[in-house]
Amino acid sequence: MNIHDKDTLHECTSCQMCAAVCPKQAICIHLNQDGFYRPVIDGEKCVDCGICKSVCYKYANIPEYKDVDKLLNYAASAKSDAVVSGTTSGGLGDILCEQLVNEGYLCVGVTYNTEKNIAVDTVAKTREESISFRGSKYIQSYTYNAFKSIVDNHLNDKVAVFGTPCHIFAIDKYLKKRKKRDNFVLIDIYCHGCPSMNVWKRYLEYVNGKTHEKSYDYVSFRSKAYGWGSYYVAQMKKGGKTLFTSPKINDKFYTLFFSDVLLNESCYDCKLRSTMDSTDIRIGDFWGKAYLKNTRGVSLVTVNHASEKGKALFEKVKDKITYKQHPATDCISYQSWGLKYDIESELRKKLFASLADPRQTIEDTVRFFWQSRSLKARLKQKAKNFILLMPRPVVAFLKGLV
């Protein structure tokens, strides 16, 4: 009995917790041909103990979450300009992390490894080590080493884990099984889904061709070069010099990411983005009409009403932030909560084949994607792009009409 059992309810999330909890080290994590982290089991080492299966989302029956109206939702921004400018939205993830480190918590979060060009979960013991957690990383993270460290070394320590809902679900399951949940604070994000690593790899080839570089000191997935809110802008720096800033519109990576065609299969009907049963706090951008004119950055902080730890932690950081409480209708309806994406299986196969073909570039893949869209969809995107190129106040006004 292990994670290769076929009685599944869902697809693999690539959380990698199965490998971290395996007492026989019978599970290794590899990128599959489509660019997703997957477990590989050594049948000679596996003793069918079932621990891996006990933390796996594939076999979990997730009940419908009925307490949405009880959740505590806040629009929040750090008072510190340095924190806000160095983060993706309002800096609340960084503020919460700083508070937890100061309380003696180890903090687990995602950093971008500029040598390997991958996102990696690491364990931070100091404030300085946690600074690299700042900023969104819109690719899968290699979590195994950090999660293994939690399982082997830190179950009796105070630990805070920042991750996607599927990461937090798996950790929460294991901690409750071991009766160690009280030692932990779990914070997840409003998650759109994770794209294939093959998209990011081919995108970097495209960027390298523009910059004539192969590595960078700093990679930002969502720069505020044009302000917060309307634009997804990648930026690469080296030696303090900005070498690449993607355009406001038609960026190759974000075109494929937000097409939703190349997400991890578990993301299409993910139940975990629509529940708070495993997490203490959920954070993200505060989308919606309330802050359309804000260019600085506003975070959405959703505190689990049933989590005393979550409520206490938010109270402790209130002196470092500006905040305002909102009903769920102002914010959660603009997130991925409750969404189910359509799987375009044939197009998905063709786009993966294009990404795998060394004779083709990511520009070819994007061109093929748009050729697959209807005339109506292409015209709609052109209209959206036209609006985004207008002055920021005009963009905010037009969005407010929708």
Language-model regions, residue ranges each:
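Conserved nucleotide-cofactor-binding alpha/beta core module
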Residues: 137-174, 178-186
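Flanking helices and flexible, charged tails adjoining ferredoxin-like Fe-S electron-transfer domains
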Residues: 1-2, 44-155, 329-349, 353-358, ...
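Short, flexible loop segments at boundaries between secondary-structure elements
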Residues: 182-206
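Gly/Ser/Thr-rich loops at beta-strand to alpha-helix junctions
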Residues: 87-91, 114, 161-171, 193-195
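Long, compositionally biased charged/polar accessory segments in the mid-to-C-terminal portions
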Residues: 103-106, 209-402
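Iron-sulfur cluster-binding cysteine motifs and their immediate structural context
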Residues: 17-40, 50-68, 280-281
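Local cysteine-cluster metal-coordination motifs and their immediate loop/turn environment
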Residues: 10-25, 47-59, 164-170, 263-275
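Ferredoxin-like iron-sulfur electron-transfer modules
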Residues: 1-16, 26-48, 77, 247-255
